[in-house]
């Protein structure tokens, strides 16, 4: 016989965050948009591939725009108004993702390029022959 236990389910209250950091990782194959609070705790994220784009369409500026819009929808539940944008990588979705976040109603405080640049560290991979 199954015993019915009285589980108390309470609705989880989302914390209110006004300032956030948008991390945009734009590679040649995909674009990942993550929005976190000032401490680095992730509030929401979206990718071009997760937004329904596959193959070579994942790496387009339009796919990055859609990913940024989806991430903005997720994060607006937290009450985020101001964003610092950190862009990493050489991909084609860099600029369009920033524009999409601006169009979503966020006040962009600053845009910082955090692409890792070696100070002559590891030897790079061989040139592609296509």
UniProtKB/Swiss-Prot annotation:
InterPro entries: Ribosomal_uS11, Ribosomal_uS11_bac-type, Ribosomal_uS11_CS, Ribosomal_uS11_sf. GO terms for molecular function: rRNA binding; structural constituent of ribosome. One of its GO terms (biological process) is translation. It comes from the Bacteria. GO terms for cellular component: ribonucleoprotein complex; ribosome. Pfam families: Ribosomal_S11. Belongs to the universal ribosomal protein uS11 family. Part of the 30S ribosomal subunit. Interacts with proteins S7 and S18. Binds to IF-3. Located on the platform of the 30S subunit, it bridges several disparate RNA helices of the 16S rRNA. Forms part of the Shine-Dalgarno cleft in the 70S ribosome. This is Small ribosomal subunit protein uS11. It comes from Blochmanniella floridana. The lineage of its organism: Bacteria, Pseudomonadati, Pseudomonadota, Gammaproteobacteria, Enterobacterales.
